[in-house]
Amino acid sequence: ITELIESGNMKTGKGLAANSVNGIITVIQNSLKLAYALGTIKEYAADKIRRPKTKEKEVTCFTLSEQKKIERAALAGKKTKWLGIVVCLYTGLRIGELLALEWKDVDFQKGVLTVSKSRHEGKDENGRYAQIVESPKTVSSRRCIPLPKQILCELRMLKRKSRSVYVISNGESSIPVRSYQRSFERLLKKLDIPHKGFHALRHTFATRALECGMDVKMLSELLGHKDPAVTLRRYVHSLMEQKKEMMNKVGNTYFKEAK
């Protein structure tokens, strides 16, 4: 394991990331479990392998003024596909989930959308480059998200004009993930907003939700996290800002009465 961490990358000779090492460990453990079940080996002890700790990625999100700038441009623009950017800001959808979303996944009567699949780029069974739509890898990623009434209204107007089965589309066809990412990058450049990845929209939703007082468990379910602890670790900075605000409110309310 130490060798993998220090020099396991066959291309560069450098170490592998903790996530990559943990993936290898999982394959080893599953293989040995099967061997033990089949009687090929007498003892299974792979659970004792110490996994390297993964570092939580730094969360980057848009400021409130940047968010408002993006929203105004997306809603005022002629490109209807840009509405997807606003949808992500108010639902926390991943880009693959957004681009796999079909109109049948939006229940206008109940005001909810169902996340049941995701789009990504890869190779098909013939080894050719393709847009692949698959079910989520985890049960928690399959979820229903209540929509703010403002977003529901925008989606209703879009549906009247849409000729596609997909919510976000180019005419009748679906949009490739990379193509949509590039459109987003161009929009940021046009608005003179510092570059951030598309995933920053998801982080922005989570940050604003916490600022509004949403509890971590509810946010975790909306984001499709398997464990609220993941949400807690990832957005601990946002929670600290919220705690500071609450503590200042307590001070402002009661300290002056004690003087």
Where are these regions (language model features)?
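Short, basic (Lys/Arg/His-rich) helix/loop patches that form interaction surfaces
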Residues: 7-14, 72-81, 91, 145, ...
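Proline-centered turn/helix-capping motifs that create local helix->coil transitions or kinks
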Residues: 35-45, 108, 117-124, 156-164, ...
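Hydrophobic recognition helices of helix-based DNA-binding modules
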Residues: 4, 28-36, 155-158, 209, ...
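Basic, Lys/Arg- and aromatic-enriched nucleic-acid-binding interface segment
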Residues: 14-18, 22-24, 37, 41-43, ...
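N-terminal core-binding DNA-recognition domain of tyrosine site-specific recombinases/integrases
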Residues: 1-40, 56, 174-179, 194-197
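C-terminal secondary-structure termini that scaffold catalytic or DNA-interacting sites
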Residues: 110, 121-142, 146-151, 157, ...
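Catalytic-site neighborhood detector that most strongly recognizes the C-terminal catalytic loop/helix
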Residues: 53, 57, 61, 119-121, ...
